[in-house]
Structure formats: C-alpha cells, structure tokens
C-alpha cells in the first residue's frame, strides 16, 4: 500500500525526475526538479496557482516514484527520455517524432552526391534544411540532377581507381562519369560548389555565370548549347523561388511562438536557413487551459527538439522558463553552441509576431473545421443510436472483414471508428491459422475469438498490474460491432460473444440484388436506411475502410509469397547466401546437383550451411 504522506515527508532535497501514476499503475506525468522535495510537494498543496490541468491530474494520482540524478541537466535529459518512452497523458505530447527531411551533399566522398536524408550526423557532409515538405526536397534534388551533371549512383568511387564502364546517365549528358575516371576530382568539385551555392541561396551568382555562357554560345552559333543553358537558368530560378528571403543574415534560426484560446494551444515553428524560410510547422495541443505561456514553450521545446534531427544555432521565442538549463541541454544534443533568445524589438521581434498571427489563424481554422465535423459525427451517432434503439451512443465502433482469393492466404481485418472518426492506431490484422480454403464464417469466428480472447487476457494483466492500460492492443471493447454480412455473420459474432459472456450489440448489412447496402439488420429486424442520409454515408465509409484494409494486407502477403524461394526454407541460408547460390549455380536444379566441395567453393558458404543444403535436397 502506497503511503502518500510518508513518501512526501521523505522526499530527498536533490535533483531528479518524478513519475506520477494512476490507480492502474500507469504513468500519467513525468517531470524534472532541481529539488525533488520542493517540486513534488507543490502538487499536493492547495493553491489557487494550480492550472485546471494540474488539478485534474492530481485527482488521478494514486502514487509516485522518483529517480535521483547528479545534476539538473541530467534530470532534464532523463525527463525527455522517459516522456518519449511512456507518452504520459498529462505531458505535452506532439503527435509524432518528426525527423524532417534534409538535403545532404556527401562532401566526404571524392565525388560527392546530393541525396535526401532524415538523419543529421557529423560525417563530413553538408546538410541543408530542414524542409517540412518531403516532396519539396524530392523536387529540388530532381531539378539539381537535371541542371548539374553529378552522379546519382551509390558506388564507392575514388580518384585514380580502376575505371569502369559508365552508365546511361553519361550517355545522355546527366553525369560526367567519375566512375570511368573521365573527370578529375577538382573539376567535379567545382560543379558541387555551384550546387552548394544554389542550396545556400546564392543562385543569382550561378544564373549570371550561366547567362554569360549562354550569350557566348549564341554568338558562336551554338544554338543547341544556348537553349540548354537557358533551360538550366529557368530551373535554377525555379529552385530559388522555392525559398523566400526574409533576413539579410545567413544564420540557421528557428522562430517559435504560440496562441492559446483559454482551452487549447497552437504552436507555430518557422525554419530559417541562410536567411530564407525553408518551411513552417504547427502543432495543436488540446486542454492546456490556463497554463502560462513560458511553461508551455519550455515544455514544447523539450518535446520538439527531443525528437527532431536538427537543432539550429539560435532559437527565438517570446518567453520561456528554464532558459539557461534548456540552452545547456540543446548545446549537449547539438554538440555545439545553441542559444535561446527573446527579442524585444526589431526584425526578429516582427518575425515572432508574424509566427504568433499564423498560430492564431491555424488554431481558429482547426477549431472551425473540428466543430463542423464534430456536429456532423455527433448527429450520425445519435441517429444510429435511435435507429438501432441502443441504450447509449456507439462511441467506438469496430468492423470486421475477411479477404481471400480462392482460399489463398485468408486474412481478417478489424477497423475502428471512435466518435465518428477512423482510428488507424487501433486497426488490427489477423492471418487465418485454423481454416483451410475459403470459409468466411469459420474465418470470421477465428478472428473474433482471437480479438476478444486477447482483450480479456489484457484486461486481466492490467488489473494485475502486469500491463499498463495504454499498452493494451485489444483491451478497449466496442460499443457496437458492424458486420459486412447478414444474419450468418451476426450469428457467428453473437456465438463468440456468448462464449466469453460479453454483451455488445452486433448489426449486419442488408444488401439489394446488386450487392449494394440498403439497410442494417439488428435483433433479427431489417431496418431500411435513407441512401442519401448521413447514416448511410457513414456506414459506407466504414465498409469501404474495412475492405481497403483487408485487401491491402492480403496483397502484401501475396507479394511476399510471390518472391518466396525454395532456398528460403533451408536452415542457415539467408539472403546473402541465397543470392550467391543463385548467382553461381544459375538455377535451383543446379544447386540440387551441386557437390559438397562445389557448395564450399562459394565464399559466403561454410561447412554447416553446405551440409544444410545437401540435407534439404537429399
């Protein structure tokens, strides 16, 4: 039994991290403290300063634990790692750990390439970004390849190495063929320097140089060359237009601001690289209530830069708490100096004001769209409740489907809709194990049995404190089960539910002679629904989604099986050995006939793997 008063009295006066837990033992909040004793006790003292969110959290705290660290910066690092691991309910959580795309110039290579990456490492390469839009990165790289004759292959090409035959890109003028040693390292580097200038925003210099060459070509009556240079100038200017200059400096900076409407908050981030805005991103955090903006920004920075691949030299914010500590943490992560600044006036301040205005507009537009959708879905669920005469609105609906082609690789799928919206994180796939051939009823019985068997097992583990509620994959049960078939599938579902003593409403579909849904069947009664109404549109959406999900899984399995080789079934034969065997022996028949000595002559094969091949084909 957790003695709260005793634990509060015996808290240490040292830095560390504390973890708040609910009555299920689930971690609902992670925080760091300079002095654990002072910080943790504050939560349990009656205070008007507590925000509504903190008050709600404290009501749910059943117990807590703490971890002592040597310093506050260690506590901050540990806090970030634990938040990422447990995703606690009351911490500010971004929807995902975004690793934005960068353009990477591989300068450590003799003949560098220009590629896209989401990881920034100290490997001697030059990185440009981040870009919020991945397709924008792809477009820019494609335009660069059309303009500059640089290599795109992954070969390890070194100056002075043995020349190899150049590929098609050389024949069509898209590469200078360093692989064939047709260009010196220094000459190739001049081309790469132009690429770097372009990505650094100095495209006007390149355009000027290309224009001079174009005019010279025209004077020499080399009209084809002049036309080619004209096209390249257009491409370079197109790349330049993709990035808007807003500052005259060439630093890498992020501008972060927020707008709160009393309940929710929108954070907006502008990414400036070399004085140009290369992208912006927004994050909407619900239920922030009256938490002050400096706390919100501090928490946001920890979450955002804890996940992103790149930390800029300078971060501008309107206000923040723990500024010095966060600077220290960012510098450690970046492995070079990173500074947080609060501009008071001037162009930096003006940019932050612009960022805040964008945050306000984004939040207002989001809420308008959200409220419109919520009203629509609320009405659909109310209508569905009334049509089926349910006791409660079906907040969570699960739909199931079976997919097979002539009994091949039968699979089942489960899709989930909560409050009228699809919830892909709760979708589940089932490979049918116990049914041979195409038997939809038996297959459906198997997947429903597995779904609720797993669910009951997880609920018991949660009750026994062996599993956290948030870690359960099947522990949340639906308010309504929607079957794509009629009475037969409904009876299968009810049979499974009765086996487990579970009471959940189950309805099926009524189809017309063209196999189009015209209504629902529930408790043995057919209910015809207006085909133009919102309920029918919703049911159709659920049907389409469960079909799509089942078919996509089935296709993926068929794709895997179509590439299956007999060699995949031999112990100790992996992908490398399989490729080597096929390369050397050309066919499975030749491998079957191979002797022990012939198998061992292949470098990747050893005695054990050779014996396995001989044993398999014996």
Swiss-Prot record:
Disulfide bonds: none annotated. This is UvrABC system protein C. It comes from the Bacteria. It is found in: Cytoplasm. The gene is uvrC. GO terms for biological process: nucleotide-excision repair; SOS response. The UvrABC repair system catalyzes the recognition and processing of DNA lesions. UvrC both incises the 5' and 3' sides of the lesion. The N-terminal half is responsible for the 3' incision and the C-terminal half is responsible for the 5' incision. Residues 204-239 form the UVR domain. It comes from Clostridium botulinum (strain Kyoto / Type A2). Belongs to the UvrC family. The lineage of its organism: Bacteria, Bacillati, Bacillota, Clostridia, Eubacteriales. Its main location: cytoplasm. GO terms for molecular function: DNA binding; excinuclease ABC activity. SMART domains: GIYc. Keywords: Cytoplasm, DNA damage, DNA excision, DNA repair, Excision nuclease, SOS response. GO terms for cellular component: cytoplasm; excinuclease repair complex.
């Amino acid at each position: 039994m957790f003695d709260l008063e005793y634990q509060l009295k015996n808290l240490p006066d040292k830095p560390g991290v504390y973890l708040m837990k609910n009555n299920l033992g689930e971690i609902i909040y992670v925080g760091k403290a300079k002095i654990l004793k002072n910080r943790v006790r504050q939560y349990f003292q009656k205070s008007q300063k507590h925000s509504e969110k903190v008050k709600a959290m404290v009501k749910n705290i059943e117990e807590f634990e703490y971890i002592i660290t040597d310093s506050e910066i260690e506590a901050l690092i540990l806090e970030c790692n634990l938040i990422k691991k447990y995703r606690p309910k009351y911490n500010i959580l971004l929807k995902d750990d975004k690793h934005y795309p960068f353009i990477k110039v591989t300068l450590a290579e003799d003949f560098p390439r220009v590629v896209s990456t989401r990881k920034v490492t100290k490997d001697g390469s030059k990185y440009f970004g981040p870009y919020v839009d991945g397709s924008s990165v792809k477009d820019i790289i494609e335009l660069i390849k059309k303009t500059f004759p640089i290599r795109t292959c992954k070969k390890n090409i070194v100056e002075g190495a043995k020349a190899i035959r150049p590929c098609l890109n050389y024949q069509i003028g898209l590469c200078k063929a360093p692989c064939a040693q047709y260009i010196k390292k220094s000459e190739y580097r001049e081309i790469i320097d132009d690429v770097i200038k372009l990505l650094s925003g100095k495209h006007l210099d390149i355009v000027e140089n290309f224009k001079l060459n174009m005019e010279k070509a025209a004077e020499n009556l080399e009209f084809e060359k002049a036309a080619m240079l004209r096209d390249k100038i257009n491409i370079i200017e197109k790349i330049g237009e993709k990035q808007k200059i807003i500052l005259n400096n060439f630093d890498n900076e992020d501008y972060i601001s927020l707008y709160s409407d009393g309940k929710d908050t929108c954070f907006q981030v502008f990414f400036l690289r070399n004085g140009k805005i290369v992208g912006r991103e927004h994050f909407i955090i619900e239920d922030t209530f009256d938490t002050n903006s400096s706390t919100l920004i501090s928490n946001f920075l920890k979450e955002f830069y804890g996940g992103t691949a790149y930390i800029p030299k300078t971060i501008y914010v309107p206000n923040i708490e723990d500024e010095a500590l966060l600077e220290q943490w960012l510098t450690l992560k970046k492995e070079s100096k990173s500074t947080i600044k609060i501009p008071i006036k001037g162009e930096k301040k003006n940019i932050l004001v612009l960022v805040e205005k964008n945050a306000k507009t984004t939040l207002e537009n989001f809420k308008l769209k959200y409220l419109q959708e919520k009203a629509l879905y609320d009405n659909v669920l109310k209508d569905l409740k009334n049509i089926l005469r349910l006791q409660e609105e079906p907040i969570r609906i699960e739909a199931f489907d079976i997919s097979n082609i002539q009994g091949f690789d039968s699979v089942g799928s489960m899709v989930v809709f909560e409050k009228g919206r699809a919830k892909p994180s709760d979708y589940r796939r089932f490979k049918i194990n116990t049914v041979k051939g195409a038997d939809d009823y038996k297959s459906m019985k198997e997947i429903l049995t597995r779904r609720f068997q797993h669910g009951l097992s997880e609920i018991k583990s949660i009750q026994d404190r062996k599993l956290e509620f948030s870690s359960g994959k099947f522990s949340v049960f639906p308010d309504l089960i929607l079957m794509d078939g009629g009475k037969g599938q409904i009876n299968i579902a009810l049979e499974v539910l009765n086996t487990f003593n579970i009471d959940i409403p189950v309805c099926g579909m009524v189809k017309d002679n063209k196999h189009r849904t015209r209504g629902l069947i529930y408790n043995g009664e057919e209910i015809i629904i207006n085909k133009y109404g919102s309920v029918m549109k919703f049911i159709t959406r659920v049907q389409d989604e469960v079909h799509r999900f089942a078919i996509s899984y089935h296709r993926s399995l068929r794709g895997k099986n179509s590439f299956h080789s007999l060699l995949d079934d031999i112990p100790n034969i992996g992908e490398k050995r399989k490729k080597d065997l096929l390369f050397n022996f050309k066919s499975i028949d030749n491998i079957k006939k191979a002797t022990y000595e012939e198998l061992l002559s292949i470098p990747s094969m050893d005695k054990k793997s050779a014996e396995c091949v001989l044993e398999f084909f014996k």
